Amino acid sequence: MAVRIKLKPGREKSLERRHPWVFSNGIHNVKGKPEAGETVDVVAHDGHWLGRGAWSPESQIQVRIWTFDREEEIDREFFKRRILRAQAGRDDLIREQGLTGYRLIAAESDGLPGITIDKYANVLVCQLLSMGADVWRDTIVDVLAELYPDCAIYERSDVDSRKKEGLASTMGLLHGTLPEMPVIIEENGIKIAVDVTKGHKTGFYLDQRDNRAMAARFVKGKSVLNCFCYTGTFGLYAANAGAASIENVDVSALALDTARLNMRVNGLNDDNVHYNEADVFKLLRQYRDEGKTFDVIVLDPPKFADNKSQLNGACRGYKDINMIALQLLNPGGVLLTFSCSGLMPADLFQKIVADAALDAKREIQFIERLSQASDHPIGSAFPEGFYLKGLVARVW
């Protein structure tokens, strides 16, 4: 008989709406002695069954629900079904955009809490961020090896959030032979170099794919400042779309080297591209003081808030950097600005940019609201899956 986790009165409502998390402060008692990662049944205070998930005793989220179907067992076939369903849901997108790099599993939003899997050509990269995901590692790898026999499988669970689960960071080859880095993926006819062993996250920001294409609409014959550029792919799309000049700015020399490589593998001349290894915050202030201006600016900063206590500081940071960027834009110019923090509500982010425009003494019009690419779905019961917010603003 499975271990049973009984909830406190009234704490069943979120699970009845199929939210997959059970917090420690919502648990009344535990019947049995579950091991970390063990499959447990969750019941309401009156005893009725709610879901089946993985036990994580050291986390504030003590159960992550695998299934809301009482008849569904958590075994190898369960993971195979989930992965096949996720792949089927992405097949149309892959054909439409010519993708060889995409997110295969988006954790809770694909019914596999704590599991992220990205496919980069013939390499699958896994992040296993929960105790349940970690315990099922060998099974997940076995299923992936069956379904994708030509792919190497590499783990990038080198993230601090595993500490909250009582897990150490880890990375390395799980199956097959890793090809020479970087691998080359394609999206929308653009080739992109990705190093899954050294790159950010799992190697690259697949979630910005649609927004890169959106940015290309505004750049023909324009001057473009691409801030926090990482491997320069907003600039790459801009070069392909005929931008007059591009400045890619990042603090990482390695990232900028990859940005140069991206231009070469696409056969693009980068005589009009400047690669600037610099602190974006300092550089924007310097350019403002020098009176330098641009037609298009992309702001894609790292996450400013990892927890709620950091949100106020993040708001100030977003306002400051957007204000300076707005001051650098020519009349009629375009700002594409992003927040990748799941804690930042979309409406609040828009208000911050609007307030930044007031401080910059610029009039702006919001012409697009942006989000993550559709291979990063948002489960209807899991609003936390909506993390990437973006705005396109015309500036006068």
Curated annotation (Swiss-Prot):
The keyword RNA-binding applies. InterPro entries: PUA (IPR002478), PUA-like_sf (IPR015947), PUA_sf (IPR036974), RLMI (IPR023542), RlmI-like_PUA (IPR041532), SAM-dep_methyl-trfase (IPR019614), SAM-dependent_MTases_sf (IPR029063). It is found in: Cytoplasm. Gene3D superfamilies: PUA domain, RNA methyltransferase domain (HRMD) like, Vaccinia Virus protein VP39. It is an enzyme of class 2 (transferase). It catalyses: cytidine(1962) in 23S rRNA + S-adenosyl-L-methionine = 5-methylcytidine(1962) in 23S rRNA + S-adenosyl-L-homocysteine + H(+). Specifically methylates the cytosine at position 1962 (m5C1962) of 23S rRNA. GO terms for molecular function: RNA binding; rRNA (cytosine) methyltransferase activity. Residues 2-79 form the PUA domain. Its EC number is 2.1.1.191. Keywords: Cytoplasm, Methyltransferase, RNA-binding, rRNA processing, S-adenosyl-L-methionine, Transferase. This is Ribosomal RNA large subunit methyltransferase I. Belongs to the methyltransferase superfamily. RlmI family. PANTHER family: RIBOSOMAL RNA LARGE SUBUNIT METHYLTRANSFERASE, S-ADENOSYLMETHIONINE-DEPENDENT METHYLTRANSFERASE DOMAIN-CONTAINING PROTEIN. It comes from Shewanella sp. (strain ANA-3). HAMAP family: 23SrRNA_methyltr_I (MF_01857). CDD domains: AdoMet_MTases, PUA_RlmI, RlmI_M_like. GO terms for cellular component: cytoplasm.
